[in-house]
C-alpha cells in the first residue's frame, strides 16, 4: 500500500485536476439507481460545492500520480454541537488496494475539523475492507430510509 498517497484537494486546486476527477465522479453517480438520481447531485453541483467548501474532495494517487480513487464528503452538524463527516461518494478503479490511504487522509481531516464520527452508505462489497479499518454496521430496529417523489 506504500505506493499510494492520499490528499485533500483545496478549493483553489480543483480546476487543475477537474478533467481527471469529473469522470470518476460520474462513474460513481452512474452506479446510483435511476430513481435515486432524480434527487442526486451532478458533477457540476459537486464542483460548486468544492469551491464553496460545502464538500471536500479527497484523492488517492499512485506512484505515477494517476488518480486511482476519490472520496467526497461533507461535514454534518448534529444538534449544533457534534460534527460528523459524511462520506457521500467513493469512486475509482482500485478501491481494494488504496482504500486504506483514502481512509487515512479523510480521517485526519475529520479529526482536524473536530468530527467525532465518520458515516457512509456504501455497497455491500465494501464491507470487508471497511471492517478491517474499524468501521461497524449500524443496525437499528426502528430505522428505515424512505423517499417520496413530488
Please place each PLM-identified region on the residue numbering.
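Acyl-donor binding region in acyl/amide transferases
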Residues: 82-133
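Conserved donor-binding loop and adjoining core beta-sheet/short helix segment
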Residues: 51-95
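Active-site rim helix/loop that mediates acceptor-substrate recognition in acyltransferases
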Residues: 34-57
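Short, flexible, glycine/charge-rich loop motifs used to bind or transfer phosphoryl groups or to couple energy/partner
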Residues: 47-48, 76-77, 108
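Hydrophobic beta-strand residues in large extracellular and virion-surface proteins
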Residues: 58-60, 118, 146
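Conserved catalytic-core motifs of GNAT/GCN5-like acyltransferases
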Residues: 136-149
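Short glycine-aromatic motifs
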Residues: 55, 132-135, 139
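Short amphipathic alpha-helix that is part of the acyltransferase structural core
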Residues: 1-41
Amino acid at each position: 500500500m506504500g505506493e499510494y498517497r492520499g490528499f485533500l484537494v483545496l478549493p483553489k486546486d480543483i480546476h487543475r485536476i477537474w478533467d481527471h476527477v469529473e469522470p470518476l465522479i460520474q462513474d460513481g453517480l452512474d452506479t446510483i439507481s435511476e430513481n435515486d438520481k432524480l434527487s442526486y447531485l451532478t458533477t457540476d453541483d459537486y464542483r460548486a460545492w468544492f469551491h464553496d467548501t460545502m464538500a471536500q474532495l479527497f484523492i488517492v494517487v499512485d506512484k505515477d500520480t494517476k488518480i486511482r480513487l476519490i472520496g467526497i464528503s461533507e461535514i454534518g452538524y448534529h444538534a449544533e454541537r457534534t460534527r460528523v463527516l459524511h462520506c457521500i461518494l467513493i469512486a475509482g478503479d482500485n478501491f481494494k488496494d488504496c482504500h486504506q490511504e483514502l481512509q487515512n487522509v479523510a480521517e485526519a481531516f475529520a479529526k482536524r475539523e473536530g468530527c467525532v464520527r465518520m458515516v457512509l452508505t456504501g455497497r455491500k462489497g465494501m464491507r470487508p475492507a471497511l471492517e478491517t479499518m474499524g468501521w461497524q454496521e449500524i443496525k437499528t430496529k426502528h430505522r428505515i430510509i424512505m423517499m417520496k417523489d413530488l
